[in-house]
Design a protein with these regions (language model features):
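Calcium-binding acidic motifs and repeat modules
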Residues: 1-179
């Protein structure tokens, strides 16, 4: 911050966002993260993250923890352009009434009610994995591949509901599943 006379100061400003998980408001940012290399999920905590993403559709990009470069986020490519820049492309709880997590939100896309997201579901082709290899929070060429391109045939929509806290407390997992 600088004043008109040229004096300046640098200070860290932390903000905390509280989300009201009700039917009528944003349910927060609880993305489905995929372990792509089989060694468990890795996350970059907020203090080490360079990622800013508009998580609540208010036009402001918030500083957030992020999936590690070897893992990926499940995304809904709403425009089919492999550009992921809207919260509704990365956060799915808003799509299913009563969903608290994004894995629960995916039930809205399970059109044949078999508790799987697979090719038998109408919008399976619209889902992809975003592997942000350079951890900048921007979906760039080669980072967003369809589930089919990734060799993912199905995602189980039931969680083990075993919570975990990772990335120095910056990431709260609400459970795991398989694909």
């Amino acid at each position: 911050v600088a004043d008109g006379a040229g004096a300046d100061t640098r200070a860290r400003i932390d903000t905390t966002y509280y989300y009201n998980y009700s039917e009528d408001t944003d349910r927060g940012f609880l993305p489905v993260t995929l372990d792509l290399n089989g060694n468990g999920l890795d996350f970059t905590g907020i203090d080490d993250s360079n990622v800013y993403f508009d998580v609540n559709n208010d036009g402001w990009r918030e500083h957030i923890a992020w999936a590690g470069a070897q893992d990926g986020l499940l995304v809904l490519d709403t425009e089919g352009d492999r550009t992921i820049d809207k919260p509704e492309e990365i956060s799915f709880a808003r799509y299913h009434p009563g969903a608290v997590t994004d894995l629960e939100g995916l039930l809205a896309f399970d059109t044949n009610d078999d508790s799987l997201l697979d090719r038998l579901d109408a919008r399976f082709k619209d889902f992809a994995v975003w592997q942000d290899k350079n951890l900048n929070g921007l979906s760039e060429e080669g980072e967003v591949l369809t589930l089919t391109e990734r060799g993912i045939e199905s995602i189980h929509l039931a969680s083990d509901r075993l919570p975990q806290t990772l990335a120095n407390g910056d990431v709260q997992l609400f459970g795991t599943s398989t694909y």
